[in-house]
C-alpha cells in the first residue's frame, strides 16, 4: 500500500487563532454588506477560488482576509458549525 492510500491526520488546535479568524470574517462581512454585496456569496467565492477580487478593499477587508490562509478560514468555519450542533470532537 503506497503512502498515498493512507489517511493522513491533521491536528490544529488554537482557540486564540479561532478568535482572530472570527474577528476577520465579521469585519469582512460588514465591509461586504456596506458595499451592497451578498457577504456569504462573496466569502464563499473567495474561499473556493482564492481570488481576492471577491473581497473589496473597503475597510481593508481584502488585506485582512489575505492575512489568513484559506484552509485556516475553512477549518474555523467547520469547527464553528459543528460546535453549534454539538458535534465537535473535544
From Swiss-Prot:
This is UPF0297 protein ABC1593. It comes from Shouchella clausii (strain KSM-K16). Belongs to the UPF0297 family. Signal peptide: none annotated. PANTHER family: UPF0297 PROTEIN YRZL (PTHR40067:SF1). Pfam families: IreB.
